[in-house]
Design a protein with these regions (language model features):
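Long, distal/terminal scaffolding or interaction modules
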Residues: 1-281
Length: 281
């Protein structure tokens, strides 16, 4: 069944639907009804406008294309699985939570607290403005993705990122098994308490990165305007730029052209720091 060029504003307007296509429709109006497509399955939604709360809860096998979910469309997708979302605006707070098997491409996300406790999700050619983005989520992939917002990727597990641009703060805290390639990360206090974080061909900017880390690896990375790095961390790092300062690394090996300052106030004998410019001088 195809529903086309209609407006819905009543409570649970299409509750429990199965196998329908919604095209060029509006979910808006004076009745201000919630949960339009709750408990639905095998749904396709195209070129539609959502200005009401909680439209996609407990859904399964959902396709959303060229749609706008406004800032009044709060908590749009919760407890939903197998959803493909493309070329859409997700602009309501807490737009994605407790979901699984989600694919997002070509989307604009403006949504604080987006993506909490999500399992198995991919993001391609998309952008987000969000605080606490993807907290406690797992099995994630990001490619050609741009983020603006504090406290991102905290407590995430099993994540891969490539060609991303992250402007953030306190990112990757307590994360586990994360690999980031060919990306720029701009933000202070990066990746504290992380475990098995690997960065390859990345640029890192900001004060006090990588403190209290375990199994941290940096391969062919630039560190710009970074000071007080690696405090209390277990690290294997190959850095191609000089660092403002390194402080009390716990264990491992750090290779770099030069550190402007080494702050060693504790026993750091288990961490080797090789400064190439000093070695060849």
């Amino acid at each position: 069944m195809v529903l086309e060029n209609k407006t819905f504003d009543e409570e649970r307007a299409l509750y429990g639907s199965s196998g329908i296509t919604v095209r060029n429709c509006r979910f808006d109006g004076p009745q201000d009804g919630e949960s339009a497509l709750k408990e639905s399955k095998e749904i396709t939604v195209e070129n539609s406008f959502f200005n009401l709360r909680y439209p996609f809860w407990h859904d399964d096998y959902l396709s959303i294309k060229n749609c706008e979910l406004t800032e009044l469309c709060r908590a749009a997708l919760w407890y939903t699985g197998h959803a493909d979302i493309s070329d859409s605006k997700l602009h309501g707070i807490k737009a994605l939570r407790e979901c699984h098997d989600i694919n997002i491409s070509g989307c604009s996300i403006v949504s604080p607290e987006f993506g909490w406790s999500v399992n198995n999700a991919s993001f391609v050619n998309s952008s987000a403005e969000s605080e606490y983005f993807m907290m406690r989520s797992s099995n994630l992939k990001f490619e050609n993705f741009r983020l603006n917002g504090k406290y991102s990727f905290q407590y995430v597990e099993n994540m891969e990122m490539a060609n991303c641009d992250l402007n953030t703060k306190d990112a990757f805290w307590h994360s586990k098994n994360v690999t980031v390639r060919d990306s720029v990360i701009n933000g202070e206090y990066l990746a504290w308490y992380s475990d098995h974080l690997t960065l390859i061909n990345c640029t890192i900017k900001g004060t006090q990165p990588f403190c209290y880390c375990t199994n941290l690896k940096l391969i062919n990375c630039k560190m710009i305007d970074t000071d007080l790095a690696f405090e209390k961390s277990e690290v294997e790092a190959e850095i191609t730029t000089e660092i403002d300062s390194i402080k009390n690394p716990k264990r491992g090996k750090i290779t770099l052209p030069r550190a402007k300052e080494l702050i060693i106030t504790e026993d750091c004998s288990q961490c080797e720091i090789i400064q190439a410019e000093l070695t060849t001088a």
